[in-house]
């Protein structure tokens, strides 16, 4: 039976005294000046964390003092948290081009200007830019026509579908944008980093083409407003008859569009700052125009504007060629013909030959804007689709028709339909009016808090614009006559912009406002598209585009601007706003589709890095948005959709063709094997990206003689970490030879597989037979996994009762395991008290998972609670993070920085900074160190039986008590675990305690105690204390039955005749014990009731003579805690703030 005795020293009645100056002097001695001490660590440095960038001087300062001496060997690769937090919390991403600008200034030798930190908030940085990009040319030039053709009901459905598509995309985009810091690069960065370079490049180029064609659309809108509504006389090409007007207009659009494009490209080339300066002016024009529309709607309810339209029968007449809506007019007492008569008749005389329809039908004049109170909404409720060349007619008007087949003279002043219209065409034309939702994410580098601003600003902007569009559909249908709505260019209202006729106070507000807004939108497109192409080019994923990554010294994309202008010219040569709009709809819809796909894939995969701060998303919403985008692509134009998908597919294959390989197996299993082989070969190409890091576990378990797992809780914990979605290998080692123990290995594998299935652990099992345990574990660590699918984390249990083992190889194997994982750059998880860990059926209804973040080793400590809380066992546990502040640290600022850092990490946790100031090393620490070193000497230099070991250590402790009390009679308390275990017993036995109590307040024995106030003179004198010994029954029986000692008792006492003094202790061990004791006191105080405590695991010493001391340090560090997980990072595991 294993036994343990506890030596407890009760405080004296008098006041306690602190250690004398001599001991104090040694307690603060500089450890770097101690002779013969080796503090270089274990010789297996971990990989440097990507967050670490400290100088050697800083490293030297980080562990001055005693509080963190236990972790001083980690400082080369893992800095103290206090020295790291400020840089992480105050991370700022520079706007695109600022780095190149700084480099150019440095090359010129000029004085570098400080880069201003981003200061834009949600309103100015996201909301207003999104409004400016969403509201555009379609609202002013085409929405009234869409309502007139499709009717209020279908237009409402159209607007609702398109706005729903963008809203779902914005939700997905918000999830991606808040999944880490999004540097300058915006939507392309988000897509490419979420779906990989192939999809990212394909979708990025589609988004670039969409933005470029959007610039062409805005320029065409600008020219249409200029020539149709502002200065019609500026037209260069004029038609000889009505049938040639359309062709003349297209040529005018091409000429003026090319000129405007050249001017805009020049402005962008000269300096984007001018574009940004006028951005607010252009936005003000948009908002003012929209407010004018609503003001006009309100005014029309009680005072409609006067815009009469002329009808011949039920046919709408264009007002360009006449002024009086009548056939005849009275001049005095004489009846004369009007100009309208001359348009339909052969002469101005009453007996002239006139058009038959003109002769049979009357001319009437009605108000084009009856107003909101007119009840017109019922007439405009349903659709009136037209074919090309058809006259726009008013329903409900009496008309004397002509015989079927009678040709219509195109020279007559009717309002004709210029194109065949149908629902899907209108969707393609309208959809560009809801694009522009990426404007906020494109400015992510300029935002003060992108994770907060992008979701809030984008969703509010979409909600605002959607409300404006939906209300505009209803209000246009309620206020404007149907024939006017179907009149695309406002010919029936004297060539006025249709929406301008409704505006108040004047139609010119809308005309001028829409002109400047379309100019501004065109400039924004020509500014954003080249930068997007530059970002794609600099990624190097499309080799032939790399030339466009170069630019001016300040980072302006000169070559990319040139290519953008050339592509934009293609859209201008098309010259039709209605033809260009469906093209850019395809590219934007494809971009939005892949944004939704990225969010759905990330949500379903549940990778450890997927931690969006935006919570209101779901994979079903993303899938719905993706399906809606795909449907809208084919609704708008199925052939354009196929072309766009073909372009994206070709780009995808071009990017990945070097690594692509097709291989077909026979049957599903053959296909699976081929896919697995292909995936493993792809993984072999390079190490995984930081964002894709996840714990790939190698779980080391021990099996008993019946090949059953000794600690099944390890596999339960593995199952609870399955949110990491990584590889799991459960390994075990059997001692012996392969030929003799192969059957046992097979049984062990079957037993482990059954337990894995019961615990729902998805992974592989591997049992190794080796001549000794250390080599077997080393082989598992080195050879586990296949190709790129290898473990990066080792999970193992703490060696229970390591003090009680006859064979010291048990804890030596453990320390060698720590060294080998460090050498292999693997993370190590050590569970202490694993039998107390919960099984999968258990549930914690409350409690906390406490993280003690002492040194930064890559973020593994942060990741593990996040993964555990995804499991139902730990789901209701809150996460608390504690970090330690030293004397020179500002604990208040540390708490703020840590809170900011966790915000960037998208992790919700309570934060507390624990202050550990420099303090004198207590007598208890000296006593613990003394006994540790004495026991180490005994066990190393003498081979005693178990009973002798107990008796001699007890004797040494009693003899050294007087020396210790002379040095410091303060409150001392000593615990020694000296076990006894029956031979061959590998199972843990219940421990029984023997207490040796030194009662300083009890009266001493007269024969051995000095007189009052007298100090003991000889170190061999009996200590003036009353000693109580409590022995268990089993202990007594064992003491009676113990055999003769092979070593003389006198010889043992001669060996320890030297008296232990505090001065003779290794000061490095004292400082490390001081760290362990102080940290343990703080951790127990704060986290005694925690369901799980995670803390950094210090590395083992280089000098193997101190291995047992290392075990003792860890034991002291974690005592009095129920469930502990020691975490030692390898440097490759990183929990990143990036998306």
From Swiss-Prot:
Give residue spans, biased composition: Acidic residues.
Answer: 982-994
Record note on quaternary structure: Homodimer; adopts a domain-swap conformation at the scissor helices connecting the transmembrane domain and C-terminal domain. Heterodimer with K-Cl cotransporters SLC12A6 and SLC12A7. Interacts with AP2A1.
Q: Which residues carry this modification: Phosphothreonine?
A: 57, 929, 1030
Task: Specify the effect of residue 311 to H.
Answer: In DEE34; results in reduced chloride transport; decreased localization at the cell surface
Q: In which tissues is it expressed?
A: Brain specific. Detected in neuronal cells.
Which parts of the sequence bind K(+)?
113, 410, 446
Q: Give residue ranges on the Extracellular side.
A: 121-129, 204-229, 277-402, 454-485
Please share what else the UniProt entry notes about this protein.
Answer: Inhibited by furosemide and bumetanide.
Q: What is the effect of changing residue 105 to A?
A: 3-fold increase in K(+) influx
Query: Which cysteines form disulfides?
Result: 310-325, 345-354
Q: Which organism is it from?
A: Homo sapiens (Human)
Which residues face the membrane's Cytoplasmic side? 1-98, 152-174, 421-429, 514-534, 579-592, 633-1139
The name on file for this protein is: Solute carrier family 12 member 5
Where does the record say carbohydrate is attached? 314, 333, 351, 362
Q: Which consequence is recorded for altering residue 1072 to C?
A: In EIG14; rare variant associated with disease susceptibility; results in reduced chloride transport
Gene name, Swiss-Prot/TrEMBL: SLC12A5
The segment annotated Disordered runs over 1-63, 92-116, 942-1052
């Amino acid at each position: 039976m294993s036994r343990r005795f506890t030596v407890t020293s009760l405080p004296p009645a008098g006041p306690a005294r602190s250690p004398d100056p001599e001991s104090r002097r040694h307690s603060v001695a500089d450890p770097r000046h101690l002779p013969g001490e080796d503090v270089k660590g274990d010789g297996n440095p971990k990989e440097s964390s990507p967050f670490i960038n400290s100088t050697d001087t800083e490293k030297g300062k980080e562990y001055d003092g005693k509080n963190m001496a236990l972790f001083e060997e980690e400082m080369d690769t893992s800095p103290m948290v206090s020295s790291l937090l400020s840089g992480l919390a105050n991370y700022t991403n520079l706007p695109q081009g600022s780095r190149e600008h700084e480099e150019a200034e440095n090359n010129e030798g000029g004085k570098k200007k400080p880069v201003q930190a981003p200061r834009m908030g949600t309103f100015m940085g996201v909301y207003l830019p999104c409004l400016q990009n969403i509201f555009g040319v379609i609202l002013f030039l085409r929405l009234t026509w869409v309502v007139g053709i499709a009717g209020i009901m279908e237009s409402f459905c159209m607007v609702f579908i398109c706005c729903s598509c963008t809203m779902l995309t914005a939700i997905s985009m918000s999830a991606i944008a808040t999944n880490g810091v999004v540097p300058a690069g915006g939507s392309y960065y988000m897509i490419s980093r979420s779906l990989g370079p192939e999809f990212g490049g394909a979708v990025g180029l589609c988004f670039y083409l969409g933005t470029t064609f959007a610039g062409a659309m805005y320029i065409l809108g600008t020219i249409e407003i200029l020539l149709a509504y502002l200065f019609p006389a500026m037209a260069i090409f004029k038609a000889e008859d009505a049938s040639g007007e359309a062709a003349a207009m297209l040529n005018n659009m091409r000429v003026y569009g090319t000129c405007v494009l050249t001017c805009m490209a020049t402005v962008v080339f000269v300096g984007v700052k001018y574009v940004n300066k006028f951005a607010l002016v252009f936005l003000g024009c948009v908002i003012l125009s929209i407010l004018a529309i609503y003001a006009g709607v309100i005014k029309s309810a009680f005072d409609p504007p006067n815009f009469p339209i002329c009808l011949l029968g039920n046919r709408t007449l264009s007002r360009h060629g006449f002024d009086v809506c009548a056939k005849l007019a009275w001049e005095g007492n004489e009846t004369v013909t009007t100009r309208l008569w001359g348009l339909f008749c052969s002469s101005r005389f009453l007996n002239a030959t006139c058009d038959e329809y003109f002769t049979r039908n009357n001319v009437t004049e009605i108000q084009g804007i009856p107003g909101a109170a007119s009840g017109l909404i019922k007439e405009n409720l349903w659709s009136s689709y037209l074919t090309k060349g058809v006259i726009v007619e008013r329903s409900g008007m009496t008309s004397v028709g002509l015989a079927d087949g009678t040709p219509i003279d195109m020279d007559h002043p009717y309002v004709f339909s210029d194109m065949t219209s149908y629902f899907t065409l209108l969707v393609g034309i309208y959809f560009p009016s809801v694009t522009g939702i990426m404007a906020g994410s494109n400015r992510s580098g300029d935002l003060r808090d992108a994770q907060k601003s992008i979701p809030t600003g984008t969703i509010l902007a979409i909600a605002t614009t959607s409300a404006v569009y939906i209300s505009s559909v209803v209000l246009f249908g309620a206020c404007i006559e149907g024939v006017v709505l179907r009149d695309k260019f406002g010919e029936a209202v004297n060539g006025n912009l249709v929406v301008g006729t409704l505006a108040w106070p004047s139609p010119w507000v809308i005309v001028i406002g829409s002109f400047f807004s379309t100019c501004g939108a065109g400039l924004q497109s020509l500014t954003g598209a080249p930068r997007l192409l530059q970002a794609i080019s600099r990624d190097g994923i499309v080799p032939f585009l790399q030339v466009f990554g170069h630019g001016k010294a300040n980072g302006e994309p000169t070559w990319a601007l040139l290519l953008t202008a050339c592509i934009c010219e293609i859209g201008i040569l098309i010259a039709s706003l209605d033809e260009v709009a469906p093209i850019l709809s395809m590219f934007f819809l494809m971009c939005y589709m892949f944004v939704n796909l990225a969010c759905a894939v990330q949500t379903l995969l549940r990778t450890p890095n997927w931690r969006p701060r935006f919570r209101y998303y779901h994979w079903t919403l993303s899938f719905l948005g993706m399906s809606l985008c795909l449907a809208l692509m084919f609704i708008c134009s199925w052939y354009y959709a196929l072309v766009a998908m073909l372009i994206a597919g070709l780009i995808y294959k071009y990017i990945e063709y070097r690594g692509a390989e097709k291989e077909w197996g026979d049957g599903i299993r053959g296909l699976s094997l081929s896919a697995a082989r292909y995936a493993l070969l792809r993984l072999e190409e390079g190490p995984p990206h930081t964002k894709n890091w996840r714990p790939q576990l190698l779980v080391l378990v021990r099996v008993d003689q019946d090949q059953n797992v000794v600690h099944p809780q390890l596999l339960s914990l593995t199952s609870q970490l399955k949110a990491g979605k990584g590889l799991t290998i459960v390994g075990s080692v059997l001692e012996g030879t392969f030929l003799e123990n192969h059957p046992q290995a097979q049984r062990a594998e079957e037993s482990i597989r059954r337990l894995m299935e019961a615990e729902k652990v998805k992974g592989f099992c591997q049992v190794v037979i080796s001549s000794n345990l250390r080599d077997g574990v080393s082989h598992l660590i080195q050879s586990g996994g296949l190709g790129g699918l290898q473990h990066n984390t080792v999970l193992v249990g703490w060696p229970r009762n390591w003090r009680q083992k006859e064979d010291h190889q048990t804890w030596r194997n453990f320390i060698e395991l720590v060294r080998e994982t460090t050498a292999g750059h693997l993370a190590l998880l050590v569970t202490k008290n694993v039998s107390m860990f919960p099984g999968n059926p258990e549930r914690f209804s409350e409690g906390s998972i406490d993280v003690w973040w002492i040194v930064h080793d890559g973020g593994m400590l942060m990741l593990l609670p996040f993964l555990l809380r995804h499991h139902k066992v730990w789901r209701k546990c809150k996460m608390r993070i504690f970090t330690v502040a030293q004397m020179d640290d500002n604990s208040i600022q540390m708490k703020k920085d840590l809170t900011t850092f966790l915000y960037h990490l998208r992790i919700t946790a309570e934060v507390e900074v624990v202050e550990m100031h420099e303090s004198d090393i207590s007598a208890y620490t000296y006593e613990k160190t003394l006994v540790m070193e004495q026991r180490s000497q005994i066990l190393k230099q003498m081979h005693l039986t178990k009973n002798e070991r107990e008796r001699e250590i007890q004797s040494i402790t009693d003899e050294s008590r007087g020396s210790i009390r002379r040095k410091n009679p303060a409150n001392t308390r000593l615990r020694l675990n000296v076990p006894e275990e029956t031979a061959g017993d590998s199972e843990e036995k219940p421990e029984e305690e023997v207490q040796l109590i030194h009662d300083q307040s009890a009266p001493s024995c007269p024969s051995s105690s000095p007189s009052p106030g007298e100090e003991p003179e000889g170190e061999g004198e009996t200590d003036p204390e009353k000693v109580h010994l409590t022995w268990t029954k089993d202990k007594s029986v064992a003491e009676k039955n113990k055999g003769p000692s092979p070593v003389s008792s006198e010889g043992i006492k001669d060996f320890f005749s030297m008296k232990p003094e505090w001065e003779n202790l290794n000061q490095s061990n004292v400082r490390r014990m001081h760290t362990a004791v102080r940290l343990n006191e703080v951790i127990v105080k704060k986290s005694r009731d925690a369901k799980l405590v995670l803390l950094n695991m210090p590395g083992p010493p280089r000098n193997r003579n101190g291995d047992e001391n290392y075990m003792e340090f860890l034991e002291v560090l974690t005592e009095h805690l129920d469930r502990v997980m020691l975490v030692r990072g390898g440097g490759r595991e990183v929990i990143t703030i990036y998306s």
